[in-house]
Amino acid sequence: MSDPDFTALQQHLLAEIAAKTIFSTSYLGKAALDPRVMDAMAKVPRHEFVPLELRPFAYIDTPLPIGYGKTISQPFIVAVMTDLLDVQPTDAVLEIGTGLGYQSAILAELARQVYSIELIEELATRAMNRLARQGHLNVDVKIGNGCHGWPEHAPFDKVIVTAAPELIPPALIYQLKPGGKMVIPAGLPEAQQLILAEKDLGGSLSTKDIFPVLFSSLEDEDAESR
């Protein structure tokens, strides 16, 4: 499949995301996502961040397997989570769960610096290679336990988590700057919610449930490292 074919498929996907946003107005409180987010989604070629054999399916609005029992998230969910995060050009963003780097690349289009943690070494290596090939030099990838965050680079303006703990890990709350935002799926597998957490200037955290989701468990990922 040629790049022009991918371009047409990507444009169709962006239109689908826009339509789903309209239908999700009651959850999101608005009928359109930030144009900066949609522009970033348009700039990042999703087919470069999926396994080669799945490239023909890269622009279907669905999760896709990337190996090791993991998936690349549904593009609509990637767009919504990025929009909720409200990334600014001066922001340092912590991402938990690099996968093959698709969400990292979206964030890299918007932020000053992205720090991403991936538990599985092979996925982290593949992500680094893909990000480098696409010219995203403002992403640092670390192999490790995402529940611990990345203290050496904290505090962070924004935090995004792509696997679901039952409760928000305390280290991630601690490493979020006052005035910062975190987007994270959390809860039991049968009752997960996408959550927007905001830390006020006094350091208190408030949370808002956005809508039900289903992500892999962050605790399961931690168990793999023991």
Question: Model-flagged regions — what are they?
Answer:
Residues 22, 46-49, 136, 181, ...:
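Generic structural signal for secondary-structure transition and capping sites
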Residues 46, 50, 55, 60-62, ...:
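Glycine-rich, flexible loop/turn motifs
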Residues 84-206:
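Conserved nucleotide-cofactor-binding alpha/beta core module
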Residues 1-20, 156, 174, 183-226:
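SAM/dcSAM-binding transferase cores
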Residues 19-20, 24, 37, 53, ...:
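Conserved alpha-helix/loop element of class I SAM-dependent methyltransferases that forms part
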